[in-house]
């Protein structure tokens, strides 16, 4: 914590340690608080250039995720070249329409934390956005390799 009571992010943190800590913390605090932690964490995230509406935001979520992760001090997505480094999973926008997107997620972070991240990101662009876990039986909590979420808005 910083002097103003806000959480202070350091420029780099090894991804394996960060993921392990987040998974342990989310297991301790439970699904609702993990969701809230994801919502809060998104306020610190950098947005790729050109994201101005919810449709573009959902299509660019994976780029935003990679921009906000560093490998050897370099963002894992370069918007100027379109180069994306692998190794931390993806947030794929499988389909999108005027009021709905389906996201497939295979990142190492906890499912409930991801729901919070996605909802917070979507609400930057559309305040009515709501995230629902599709196929709850197919979930990383149960050992599945991915989760799917529906993002809907009015």
PLM feature spans:
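Short terminal or interdomain "cap/linker" segment that borders an active site or interface and mediates
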Residues: 81-115, 123, 127-154
């Amino acid at each position: 914590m910083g002097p103003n009571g806000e959480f202070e992010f350091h420029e780099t943190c090894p991804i394996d340690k960060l993921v392990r800590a987040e998974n342990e913390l989310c297991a301790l605090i439970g699904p609702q608080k993990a969701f809230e932690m994801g919502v809060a964490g998104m306020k610190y995230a950098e947005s790729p250039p050109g994201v101005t509406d919810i449709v573009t935001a959902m299509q660019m979520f994976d780029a935003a995720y990679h921009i906000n992760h560093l490998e050897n001090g370099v963002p894992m997505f370069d918007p100027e070249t379109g180069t994306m480094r692998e190794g931390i999973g993806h947030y794929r926008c499988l389909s999108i329409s005027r009021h709905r997107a389906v996201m497939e997620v295979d990142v190492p972070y906890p499912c409930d934390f991801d729901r919070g991240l996605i909802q917070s990101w979507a609400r930057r662009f559309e305040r009515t956005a709501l995230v629902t876990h599709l196929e709850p039986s197919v979930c990383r909590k149960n050992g599945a390799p991915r989760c799917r979420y529906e993002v809907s808005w009015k």
